[in-house]
Amino acid sequence: MDRIRIVGGRTLEGTIKISGAKNAALPLMIASLLTSETLTLENVPALADVNMLLRILGHHGVDYSVNGRRAGEEPHASRAIHLTAGTIVDIMAPYDLVSKMRASFWVIAPLLARMGEARVSLPGGCAIGTRPVDLLLMVLEKLGAKIEIEAGYVHAKAPKGLHGAEITFPKVTVGGTHTALMAASLAQGHTLLVNAAREPEIVDLANCLTKMGAKIKGAGQSTVEIEGVGRLSGASHKVLPDRIEAGTYAIAVAMAGGDVLLEGAEADLLQTALDTIEQAGARISVTNEGIRVRRNGAGLQPVDVTTAPFPGFPTDLQAQFMALMTKAKGSSTITETIFENRFMHVQELARLGAHIRLEGDAAIVEGVETLQGAPVMATDLRASVSLVIAALAAQGETMVNRVYHLDRGFEHLEEKLGRCGAIIERISGTA
Protein backbone atom coordinates (compact mmCIF):
# COMPACT_ATOMS: atom_id res chain seq x y z
CA MET A 1 0.00 0.00 0.00
CA ASP A 2 1.43 3.37 -1.03
CA ARG A 3 2.42 6.08 1.42
CA ILE A 4 3.33 9.74 0.95
CA ARG A 5 6.35 11.21 2.70
CA ILE A 6 6.46 14.96 3.33
CA VAL A 7 9.18 17.08 4.91
CA GLY A 8 7.67 20.36 6.06
CA GLY A 9 9.02 23.88 6.10
CA ARG A 10 9.21 24.72 2.39
CA THR A 11 7.18 27.52 0.82
CA LEU A 12 5.28 26.90 -2.42
CA GLU A 13 6.19 28.85 -5.57
CA GLY A 14 5.00 28.29 -9.12
CA THR A 15 1.93 27.17 -11.06
CA ILE A 16 -0.55 24.37 -10.40
CA LYS A 17 -2.90 23.41 -13.23
CA ILE A 18 -6.37 22.69 -11.86
CA SER A 19 -7.91 19.46 -13.10
CA GLY A 20 -11.47 18.77 -14.16
CA ALA A 21 -13.90 18.37 -11.28
CA LYS A 22 -14.39 14.86 -9.99
CA ASN A 23 -17.78 15.79 -8.54
CA ALA A 24 -18.90 16.90 -12.00
CA ALA A 25 -17.21 14.15 -14.02
CA LEU A 26 -18.87 11.24 -12.21
CA PRO A 27 -22.53 12.22 -12.81
CA LEU A 28 -21.65 13.31 -16.35
CA MET A 29 -20.23 9.85 -17.04
CA ILE A 30 -23.34 8.24 -15.57
CA ALA A 31 -25.48 10.38 -17.89
CA SER A 32 -24.03 8.40 -20.81
CA LEU A 33 -26.52 5.65 -19.89
CA LEU A 34 -29.38 7.94 -20.98
CA THR A 35 -28.56 7.66 -24.69
CA SER A 36 -27.49 5.04 -27.20
CA GLU A 37 -25.24 7.59 -28.88
CA THR A 38 -21.70 8.64 -27.92
CA LEU A 39 -21.11 11.12 -25.12
CA THR A 40 -17.63 12.66 -25.22
CA LEU A 41 -16.34 14.25 -22.02
CA GLU A 42 -13.18 16.36 -22.05
CA ASN A 43 -11.05 17.49 -19.11
CA VAL A 44 -11.81 14.32 -17.13
CA PRO A 45 -9.32 13.88 -14.26
CA ALA A 46 -7.23 10.71 -13.96
CA LEU A 47 -8.60 9.41 -10.65
CA ALA A 48 -9.31 6.06 -9.06
CA ASP A 49 -13.02 6.91 -8.78
CA VAL A 50 -13.20 7.69 -12.50
CA ASN A 51 -11.56 4.38 -13.33
CA MET A 52 -13.90 2.51 -11.00
CA LEU A 53 -16.95 4.14 -12.57
CA LEU A 54 -15.71 3.15 -16.03
CA ARG A 55 -15.69 -0.46 -14.80
CA ILE A 56 -19.24 -0.09 -13.53
CA LEU A 57 -20.46 1.50 -16.76
CA GLY A 58 -18.70 -1.21 -18.74
CA HIS A 59 -20.61 -3.80 -16.73
CA HIS A 60 -23.85 -2.25 -18.01
CA GLY A 61 -22.65 -2.41 -21.61
CA VAL A 62 -21.07 0.99 -22.11
CA ASP A 63 -18.23 0.95 -24.63
CA TYR A 64 -15.59 3.51 -23.75
CA SER A 65 -12.20 4.76 -24.84
CA VAL A 66 -9.83 7.00 -22.92
CA ASN A 67 -7.15 9.28 -24.31
CA GLY A 68 -4.42 8.76 -21.73
CA ARG A 69 -0.98 10.30 -21.41
CA ARG A 70 1.11 10.69 -24.49
CA ALA A 71 4.85 11.26 -24.65
CA GLY A 72 5.77 14.81 -23.71
CA GLU A 73 2.44 15.61 -22.05
CA GLU A 74 2.23 17.12 -18.60
CA PRO A 75 1.56 14.38 -16.05
CA HIS A 76 -1.76 16.02 -15.16
CA ALA A 77 -2.90 16.39 -18.76
CA SER A 78 -6.68 16.14 -19.00
CA ARG A 79 -8.32 13.15 -20.61
CA ALA A 80 -11.13 12.81 -23.10
CA ILE A 81 -13.45 9.88 -22.50
CA HIS A 82 -15.83 8.61 -25.18
CA LEU A 83 -18.80 6.68 -23.77
CA THR A 84 -21.36 4.78 -25.87
CA ALA A 85 -24.23 2.91 -24.21
CA GLY A 86 -25.54 1.44 -27.46
CA THR A 87 -27.19 -1.47 -25.70
CA ILE A 88 -27.76 -1.82 -21.97
CA VAL A 89 -26.77 -5.42 -21.28
CA ASP A 90 -27.50 -5.52 -17.54
CA ILE A 91 -29.90 -3.47 -15.42
CA MET A 92 -28.31 -4.75 -12.22
CA ALA A 93 -25.39 -2.95 -10.55
CA PRO A 94 -23.84 -5.54 -8.23
CA TYR A 95 -22.56 -5.06 -4.70
CA ASP A 96 -18.93 -5.86 -5.55
CA LEU A 97 -18.81 -2.78 -7.81
CA VAL A 98 -21.21 -0.30 -6.20
CA SER A 99 -19.86 -0.92 -2.70
CA LYS A 100 -16.54 0.62 -3.72
CA MET A 101 -17.97 4.07 -4.55
CA ARG A 102 -21.19 5.66 -3.34
CA ALA A 103 -21.67 7.88 -6.39
CA SER A 104 -22.11 4.78 -8.54
CA PHE A 105 -25.56 4.32 -6.97
CA TRP A 106 -26.68 7.18 -9.25
CA VAL A 107 -26.79 4.73 -12.19
CA ILE A 108 -30.25 3.80 -10.90
CA ALA A 109 -31.83 6.93 -12.43
CA PRO A 110 -30.69 6.59 -16.06
CA LEU A 111 -31.14 2.81 -16.05
CA LEU A 112 -34.71 3.21 -14.80
CA ALA A 113 -35.49 6.10 -17.14
CA ARG A 114 -34.19 4.33 -20.22
CA MET A 115 -34.98 0.68 -19.49
CA GLY A 116 -37.98 0.93 -17.17
CA GLU A 117 -36.23 -1.09 -14.49
CA ALA A 118 -33.04 -1.07 -12.41
CA ARG A 119 -31.64 -3.18 -9.61
CA VAL A 120 -28.77 -1.48 -7.78
CA SER A 121 -26.86 -2.43 -4.66
CA LEU A 122 -26.93 -0.05 -1.73
CA PRO A 123 -23.70 1.98 -1.86
CA GLY A 124 -20.28 2.14 -0.21
CA GLY A 125 -17.50 4.77 -0.53
CA CYS A 126 -16.15 7.20 2.08
CA ALA A 127 -17.26 6.36 5.61
CA ILE A 128 -18.79 9.78 6.28
CA GLY A 129 -21.96 9.28 8.28
CA THR A 130 -24.83 7.33 6.78
CA ARG A 131 -25.39 9.34 3.58
CA PRO A 132 -28.83 7.74 3.11
CA VAL A 133 -30.23 7.26 -0.38
CA ASP A 134 -33.77 7.98 0.83
CA LEU A 135 -34.01 11.30 -1.00
CA LEU A 136 -32.86 9.74 -4.26
CA LEU A 137 -35.51 7.06 -3.97
CA MET A 138 -38.12 9.67 -3.06
CA VAL A 139 -37.37 11.38 -6.37
CA LEU A 140 -37.89 8.18 -8.34
CA GLU A 141 -41.13 7.38 -6.51
CA LYS A 142 -42.46 10.89 -7.20
CA LEU A 143 -41.72 10.27 -10.88
CA GLY A 144 -43.81 7.09 -10.80
CA ALA A 145 -41.35 4.32 -9.96
CA LYS A 146 -42.20 1.46 -7.64
CA ILE A 147 -39.34 0.84 -5.20
CA GLU A 148 -38.54 -2.32 -3.26
CA ILE A 149 -35.50 -2.84 -1.03
CA GLU A 150 -34.48 -6.41 -0.38
CA ALA A 151 -31.23 -8.20 0.48
CA GLY A 152 -29.16 -5.04 0.15
CA TYR A 153 -30.51 -4.11 -3.28
CA VAL A 154 -32.89 -1.42 -4.48
CA HIS A 155 -35.25 -2.68 -7.17
CA ALA A 156 -36.94 0.15 -9.10
CA LYS A 157 -39.62 -0.44 -11.73
CA ALA A 158 -41.50 1.86 -14.10
CA PRO A 159 -42.72 -0.43 -16.90
CA LYS A 160 -44.86 2.32 -18.44
CA GLY A 161 -42.12 4.90 -18.11
CA LEU A 162 -41.63 7.78 -15.69
CA HIS A 163 -43.90 10.80 -15.58
CA GLY A 164 -43.28 14.39 -14.55
CA ALA A 165 -44.07 15.58 -11.03
CA GLU A 166 -43.52 18.37 -8.56
CA ILE A 167 -40.70 17.41 -6.20
CA THR A 168 -39.96 19.44 -3.10
CA PHE A 169 -36.73 18.42 -1.39
CA PRO A 170 -36.99 18.54 2.43
CA LYS A 171 -33.34 19.55 2.47
CA VAL A 172 -30.84 20.49 -0.20
CA THR A 173 -29.41 17.33 -1.74
CA VAL A 174 -26.84 17.17 -4.53
CA GLY A 175 -27.44 13.48 -5.18
CA GLY A 176 -31.19 13.94 -5.21
CA THR A 177 -30.94 16.83 -7.65
CA HIS A 178 -28.61 14.86 -9.95
CA THR A 179 -31.08 11.98 -9.86
CA ALA A 180 -34.03 14.22 -10.67
CA LEU A 181 -32.28 15.92 -13.59
CA MET A 182 -31.37 12.62 -15.23
CA ALA A 183 -34.63 10.78 -14.59
CA ALA A 184 -36.96 13.68 -15.41
CA SER A 185 -35.17 14.39 -18.69
CA LEU A 186 -36.67 11.17 -20.09
CA ALA A 187 -39.95 11.30 -18.14
CA GLN A 188 -43.27 12.12 -19.78
CA GLY A 189 -44.38 15.66 -19.06
CA HIS A 190 -43.27 18.49 -16.81
CA THR A 191 -41.19 18.22 -13.62
CA LEU A 192 -40.71 21.01 -11.09
CA LEU A 193 -37.89 20.80 -8.53
CA VAL A 194 -38.23 22.95 -5.41
CA ASN A 195 -35.28 23.51 -3.04
CA ALA A 196 -32.91 21.99 -5.60
CA ALA A 197 -29.15 22.00 -5.04
CA ARG A 198 -27.37 24.95 -6.68
CA GLU A 199 -23.81 23.56 -6.86
CA PRO A 200 -21.77 24.32 -10.00
CA GLU A 201 -21.57 20.58 -10.66
CA ILE A 202 -25.38 20.51 -10.89
CA VAL A 203 -25.23 23.28 -13.49
CA ASP A 204 -22.54 21.38 -15.39
CA LEU A 205 -24.73 18.27 -15.57
CA ALA A 206 -27.72 20.32 -16.69
CA ASN A 207 -25.63 22.00 -19.40
CA CYS A 208 -24.47 18.63 -20.69
CA LEU A 209 -27.99 17.17 -20.62
CA THR A 210 -29.21 20.22 -22.54
CA LYS A 211 -26.59 19.56 -25.22
CA MET A 212 -27.97 16.00 -25.36
CA GLY A 213 -31.47 17.36 -26.03
CA ALA A 214 -32.94 17.74 -22.55
CA LYS A 215 -35.17 20.72 -21.78
CA ILE A 216 -34.03 22.19 -18.45
CA LYS A 217 -34.61 25.69 -17.09
CA GLY A 218 -33.24 27.23 -13.91
CA ALA A 219 -30.27 24.99 -13.12
CA GLY A 220 -28.18 26.71 -10.46
CA GLN A 221 -31.29 28.16 -8.85
CA SER A 222 -33.40 26.61 -6.11
CA THR A 223 -36.33 26.06 -8.51
CA VAL A 224 -35.69 24.01 -11.65
CA GLU A 225 -38.07 22.97 -14.43
CA ILE A 226 -37.60 19.96 -16.70
CA GLU A 227 -39.76 19.09 -19.69
CA GLY A 228 -39.30 15.43 -20.54
CA VAL A 229 -38.28 14.33 -24.04
CA GLY A 230 -38.60 11.02 -25.83
CA ARG A 231 -34.90 10.44 -26.34
CA LEU A 232 -31.51 12.02 -25.77
CA SER A 233 -28.66 12.13 -28.26
CA GLY A 234 -24.89 12.17 -28.05
CA ALA A 235 -22.90 15.30 -27.29
CA SER A 236 -19.47 16.68 -26.41
CA HIS A 237 -18.89 18.47 -23.13
CA LYS A 238 -15.91 19.82 -21.19
CA VAL A 239 -15.92 19.13 -17.45
CA LEU A 240 -15.69 22.31 -15.40
CA PRO A 241 -12.55 22.94 -13.28
CA ASP A 242 -12.43 21.39 -9.82
CA ARG A 243 -13.32 24.06 -7.26
CA ILE A 244 -12.45 21.72 -4.39
CA GLU A 245 -8.99 21.04 -5.79
CA ALA A 246 -8.49 24.78 -6.33
CA GLY A 247 -9.62 25.54 -2.78
CA THR A 248 -7.39 22.81 -1.41
CA TYR A 249 -4.26 24.22 -3.08
CA ALA A 250 -5.23 27.75 -2.05
CA ILE A 251 -5.33 26.53 1.55
CA ALA A 252 -2.01 24.71 1.06
CA VAL A 253 -0.35 27.96 -0.06
CA ALA A 254 -1.88 29.81 2.88
CA MET A 255 -0.49 27.12 5.19
CA ALA A 256 3.02 26.79 3.75
CA GLY A 257 3.44 30.36 2.51
CA GLY A 258 4.58 31.33 -0.96
CA ASP A 259 3.10 32.47 -4.26
CA VAL A 260 1.20 30.08 -6.55
CA LEU A 261 -0.99 30.54 -9.62
CA LEU A 262 -3.88 28.09 -9.74
CA GLU A 263 -4.13 27.88 -13.50
CA GLY A 264 -7.64 27.40 -14.86
CA ALA A 265 -9.36 27.88 -11.51
CA GLU A 266 -12.58 29.90 -11.61
CA ALA A 267 -13.16 32.21 -8.64
CA ASP A 268 -16.93 32.34 -8.99
CA LEU A 269 -17.09 28.61 -8.27
CA LEU A 270 -15.63 29.03 -4.77
CA GLN A 271 -15.94 32.68 -3.80
CA THR A 272 -17.03 32.00 -0.21
CA ALA A 273 -14.03 29.75 0.37
CA LEU A 274 -11.64 32.28 -1.18
CA ASP A 275 -13.04 35.06 1.00
CA THR A 276 -12.55 32.86 4.07
CA ILE A 277 -8.97 31.94 3.13
CA GLU A 278 -8.26 35.63 2.60
CA GLN A 279 -9.62 36.45 6.06
CA ALA A 280 -7.15 33.91 7.44
CA GLY A 281 -4.22 35.87 6.01
CA ALA A 282 -3.68 34.90 2.38
CA ARG A 283 -3.71 37.41 -0.47
CA ILE A 284 -5.87 36.30 -3.36
CA SER A 285 -6.20 37.87 -6.79
CA VAL A 286 -8.06 36.75 -9.89
CA THR A 287 -6.20 36.87 -13.22
CA ASN A 288 -7.00 35.89 -16.79
CA GLU A 289 -5.08 32.67 -16.17
CA GLY A 290 -6.71 31.65 -12.91
CA ILE A 291 -6.37 32.49 -9.21
CA ARG A 292 -3.14 33.70 -7.62
CA VAL A 293 -2.64 32.90 -3.92
CA ARG A 294 0.13 34.47 -1.82
CA ARG A 295 1.15 34.54 1.80
CA ASN A 296 4.37 35.98 3.17
CA GLY A 297 5.66 35.56 6.72
CA ALA A 298 2.57 37.13 8.31
CA GLY A 299 0.80 34.90 10.81
CA LEU A 300 -2.52 33.19 10.20
CA GLN A 301 -5.68 34.61 11.76
CA PRO A 302 -8.45 32.46 13.28
CA VAL A 303 -11.70 32.38 11.29
CA ASP A 304 -14.95 30.68 12.25
CA VAL A 305 -16.52 28.57 9.50
CA THR A 306 -19.87 26.82 9.07
CA THR A 307 -20.27 24.47 6.12
CA ALA A 308 -23.32 25.03 3.93
CA PRO A 309 -24.68 24.13 0.50
CA PHE A 310 -23.44 26.24 -2.40
CA PRO A 311 -22.79 29.17 -2.40
CA GLY A 312 -21.76 28.64 1.23
CA PHE A 313 -18.48 27.22 2.51
CA PRO A 314 -18.07 23.71 1.00
CA THR A 315 -18.10 20.72 3.31
CA ASP A 316 -15.44 19.24 1.02
CA LEU A 317 -13.01 21.97 2.19
CA GLN A 318 -13.81 21.68 5.88
CA ALA A 319 -10.97 19.29 6.77
CA GLN A 320 -8.43 21.32 4.78
CA PHE A 321 -9.46 24.57 6.44
CA MET A 322 -9.28 22.94 9.85
CA ALA A 323 -5.67 22.00 9.10
CA LEU A 324 -4.99 25.66 8.28
CA MET A 325 -6.55 26.82 11.55
CA THR A 326 -4.22 24.58 13.58
CA LYS A 327 -1.52 27.22 12.98
CA ALA A 328 -3.70 30.32 13.46
CA LYS A 329 -3.01 32.79 16.27
CA GLY A 330 -6.05 32.08 18.40
CA SER A 331 -9.20 29.98 18.54
CA SER A 332 -11.53 29.14 15.66
CA THR A 333 -14.76 27.15 15.51
CA ILE A 334 -15.58 24.94 12.54
CA THR A 335 -19.17 23.72 12.36
CA GLU A 336 -20.20 20.88 10.04
CA THR A 337 -23.84 20.99 8.93
CA ILE A 338 -23.83 18.77 5.83
CA PHE A 339 -22.50 15.37 6.93
CA GLU A 340 -22.33 13.67 10.28
CA ASN A 341 -19.12 11.93 11.35
CA ARG A 342 -16.92 14.20 9.23
CA PHE A 343 -14.33 14.95 11.89
CA MET A 344 -12.32 11.75 11.57
CA HIS A 345 -9.24 13.77 10.66
CA VAL A 346 -9.16 15.43 14.09
CA GLN A 347 -7.42 12.52 15.79
CA GLU A 348 -4.74 12.35 13.10
CA LEU A 349 -4.15 16.12 13.12
CA ALA A 350 -3.66 15.80 16.87
CA ARG A 351 -0.78 13.39 16.18
CA LEU A 352 0.96 16.31 14.47
CA GLY A 353 0.46 18.49 17.54
CA ALA A 354 -2.87 20.17 16.73
CA HIS A 355 -5.10 21.22 19.63
CA ILE A 356 -8.71 20.43 18.66
CA ARG A 357 -11.71 19.49 20.76
CA LEU A 358 -15.09 18.35 19.50
CA GLU A 359 -18.43 19.65 20.73
CA GLY A 360 -21.25 17.99 18.81
CA ASP A 361 -21.19 19.17 15.22
CA ALA A 362 -18.45 21.71 15.94
CA ALA A 363 -14.67 21.54 16.30
CA ILE A 364 -12.87 24.17 18.35
CA VAL A 365 -9.33 24.63 17.08
CA GLU A 366 -6.72 26.31 19.28
CA GLY A 367 -3.87 27.39 17.06
CA VAL A 368 -0.37 26.26 17.99
CA GLU A 369 3.03 27.73 17.21
CA THR A 370 4.52 24.51 15.87
CA LEU A 371 3.31 21.27 14.30
CA GLN A 372 5.60 18.25 14.43
CA GLY A 373 5.84 15.60 11.72
CA ALA A 374 4.62 12.10 12.59
CA PRO A 375 3.15 8.98 10.98
CA VAL A 376 -0.56 9.54 10.27
CA MET A 377 -3.36 7.59 8.61
CA ALA A 378 -5.85 8.87 6.05
CA THR A 379 -9.45 7.99 6.88
CA ASP A 380 -11.28 9.44 3.87
CA LEU A 381 -10.64 11.57 0.80
CA ARG A 382 -10.76 15.10 2.21
CA ALA A 383 -9.27 14.09 5.57
CA SER A 384 -6.25 12.64 3.79
CA VAL A 385 -5.42 15.89 2.02
CA SER A 386 -5.86 17.85 5.26
CA LEU A 387 -2.99 15.79 6.67
CA VAL A 388 -0.85 16.67 3.64
CA ILE A 389 -1.60 20.37 4.19
CA ALA A 390 -0.68 20.17 7.87
CA ALA A 391 2.49 18.26 7.02
CA LEU A 392 3.63 21.05 4.67
CA ALA A 393 3.96 23.35 7.69
CA ALA A 394 5.11 20.76 10.24
CA GLN A 395 8.69 20.43 11.43
CA GLY A 396 10.36 17.27 10.22
CA GLU A 397 8.95 14.29 8.37
CA THR A 398 5.34 13.18 8.08
CA MET A 399 4.33 9.84 6.59
CA VAL A 400 0.73 9.68 5.36
CA ASN A 401 -0.59 6.13 5.14
CA ARG A 402 -3.60 4.83 3.17
CA VAL A 403 -3.12 7.33 0.37
CA TYR A 404 -5.49 5.40 -1.87
CA HIS A 405 -8.04 7.83 -0.45
CA LEU A 406 -6.08 10.69 -2.06
CA ASP A 407 -5.98 8.89 -5.39
CA ARG A 408 -9.78 8.82 -5.42
CA GLY A 409 -10.03 12.60 -5.67
CA PHE A 410 -6.71 14.36 -6.33
CA GLU A 411 -4.91 13.99 -9.63
CA HIS A 412 -1.11 13.70 -9.23
CA LEU A 413 -1.10 15.68 -5.97
CA GLU A 414 2.49 14.92 -5.04
CA GLU A 415 3.71 15.93 -8.52
CA LYS A 416 1.80 19.21 -8.46
CA LEU A 417 3.05 20.16 -5.00
CA GLY A 418 6.56 18.93 -5.74
CA ARG A 419 6.84 21.19 -8.76
CA CYS A 420 6.11 24.14 -6.47
CA GLY A 421 8.93 23.28 -4.09
CA ALA A 422 7.35 20.94 -1.56
CA ILE A 423 9.48 18.03 -0.38
CA ILE A 424 6.97 15.29 -1.07
CA GLU A 425 7.26 11.81 -2.53
CA ARG A 426 5.19 8.71 -2.99
CA ILE A 427 6.62 5.52 -1.57
CA SER A 428 5.08 2.61 -3.43
CA GLY A 429 4.07 -0.79 -2.20
CA THR A 430 4.71 -0.30 1.51
CA ALA A 431 2.35 -1.94 3.94
Curated annotation (Swiss-Prot):
It is found in: Cytoplasm. Its EC number is 2.5.1.7. The modification 2-(S-cysteinyl)pyruvic acid O-phosphothioketal is found at C126. GO terms for molecular function: UDP-N-acetylglucosamine 1-carboxyvinyltransferase activity. Phosphoenolpyruvate binds at K22, N23. Pathway: Cell wall biogenesis; peptidoglycan biosynthesis. The keyword Transferase applies. UDP-N-acetyl-alpha-D-glucosamine binds at R102, R131, P132, V133, D134, L135, D316, I338. It comes from the Bacteria. It catalyses: phosphoenolpyruvate + UDP-N-acetyl-alpha-D-glucosamine = UDP-N-acetyl-3-O-(1-carboxyvinyl)-alpha-D-glucosamine + phosphate. GO terms for biological process: cell division; cell wall organization; peptidoglycan biosynthetic process; regulation of cell shape; UDP-N-acetylgalactosamine biosynthetic process. The active site is at C126. Keywords: Cell cycle, Cell division, Cell shape, Cell wall biogenesis/degradation, Cytoplasm, Peptidoglycan synthesis, Pyruvate, Transferase. Cell wall formation. Adds enolpyruvyl to UDP-N-acetylglucosamine. Belongs to the EPSP synthase family. MurA subfamily. This is UDP-N-acetylglucosamine 1-carboxyvinyltransferase.
